[in-house]
Amino acid sequence: MIGGLFIYNHKGEVLISRVYRDDIGRNAVDAFRVNVIHARQQVRSPVTNIARTSFFHVKRSNIWLAAVTKQNVNAAMVFEFLYKMCDVMAAYFGKISEENIKNNFVLIYELLDEILDFGYPQNSETGALKTFITQQGIKSQHQTKEEQSQITSQVTGQIGWRREGIKYRRNELFLDVLESVNLLMSPQGQVLSAHVSGRVVMKSYLSGMPECKFGMNDKIVIEKQGKGTADETSKSGKQSIAIDDCTFHQCVRLSKFDSERSISFIPPDGEFELMRYRTTKDIILPFRVIPLVREVGRTKLEVKVVIKSNFKPSLLAQKIEVRIPTPLNTSGVQVICMKGKAKYKASENAIVWKIKRMAGMKESQISAEIELLPTNDKKKWARPPISMNFEVPFAPSGLKVRYLKVFEPKLNYSDHDVIKWVRYIGRSGIYETRC
């Protein structure tokens, strides 16, 4: 499994070093520094093989985390551990920086002792770790038998992600459906590729050990090898959603999801990611971009771009930004826009059009005259795609929360006693239209 873990600063100096296997020597530290951190060319691959040794590395600000092994390991598992390690450190001392790591090096070694056992990842849940590793990294020597039994049951039992005895004056549950819609469209309006990457993030401030049940669209189709029935609708008339793949937090009971398409779980305390999913079928495209580019001789271009919002009139899109590329030999630009503000940025070779808000089923347009410098280059302008950024208050995949129920039999509070909030946020990923 993992033979060693090293944490470096931007100079390549080792801040944290822990070796778990005898086959990892001191030369591994120097090899990573020379071949990755101080490499003449930027290393783009997150996995680097040097002398039959594999280095799995991630970077946070100016800090490098590198897991080293000489064995054939599961790469996804190693990266999951590295990202979890970053989350745990951030939960304990905030920003991952050289100063914070030096100030908390004792705490980090304690965390590594609990998270990795002879190179095998064990317990990386922040809630469980904070039960027996304090903020200062000093373990309490005066624990009662009851406290010790709680720690043991949490670490080794079925519910390692939540400790017992949590109490809140007001029980609250916040659920965010966060989606990123990606699109590539032809100038004629044909969708060349489109997909949505989504996350369901929950903030749980509930007392005791509550049972939560979360239901989505009446019918969810989990696609397998590209086959499915995405266009089916349930008997109640509500549209189904076809999910290509999804992953869940370890607290979710998968047997319930397979049989009922509902998500049952005992949530961790605080913020966590309940599920992550991806879909490519029946996507609601929030905006359509209609470009028109006309060449007037060799020294002038006329550009007209229309954007149309494709959602309910009662909803408002925000933070809208359209980037219209211009040729490298542009000498001047005159812009007229119906709404918002537009500006030519010579350093980026683009016209940037910003609109604060736009309601659904509306359209707006921008016109520009682009003056070009004479050039001897016979190669025609490649016409890069027009890109767009935005934020909308709905899920482009069509995912909807039907219900969110909470039960806590021991403390005798019911679903009606819990304050619940559900929010949908759809953002643009790579949203481009060719022109």
Swiss-Prot record:
Keyword field: Cell membrane, Coated pit, Endocytosis, Lipid-binding, Membrane, Phosphoprotein, Protein transport, Transport
Name of one Pfam family that matches: Adap_comp_sub
Residue span(s) of domain MHD: 170-434
Domain of life of the organism encoding this protein: Eukaryota
Post-translational modification: Phosphorylation at Thr-156 increases the affinity of the AP-2 complex for cargo membrane proteins during the initial stages of endocytosis.
Record's subunit section: Adaptor protein complex 2 (AP-2) is a heterotetramer composed of two large adaptins (alpha-type subunit AP2A1 or AP2A2 and beta-type subunit AP2B1), a medium adaptin (mu-type subunit AP2M1) and a small adaptin (sigma-type subunit AP2S1). Interacts with ATP6V1H and MEGF10. Interacts with EGFR and TTGN1. Interacts with F2R. Interacts with PIP5K1C; tyrosine phosphorylation of PIP5K1C weakens the interaction. Interacts with KIAA0319; required for clathrin-mediated endocytosis of KIAA0319. Interacts with DVL2 (via DEP domain).
Membership in a protein family: Belongs to the adaptor complexes medium subunit family.
GO biological process: clathrin-dependent endocytosis; intracellular protein transport; negative regulation of protein localization to plasma membrane; positive regulation of receptor internalization; positive regulation of synaptic vesicle endocytosis; postsynaptic neurotransmitter receptor internalization; protein-containing complex assembly; receptor internalization
Membrane topology: Peripheral membrane protein
Cellular component GO terms held in the UniProt record: AP-2 adaptor complex; clathrin-coated pit; cytoplasmic vesicle; extrinsic component of presynaptic endocytic zone membrane; glutamatergic synapse; plasma membrane; postsynapse; synapse
Name of the protein this chain belongs to: AP-2 complex subunit mu
UniProt: a 1,2-diacyl-sn-glycero-3-phospho-(1D-myo-inositol-3,4,5-trisphosphate) binding residues: K341, K345, K354
PROSITE patterns, per the entry: CLAT_ADAPTOR_M_1, CLAT_ADAPTOR_M_2, MHD
Organism from which the protein derives: Rattus norvegicus
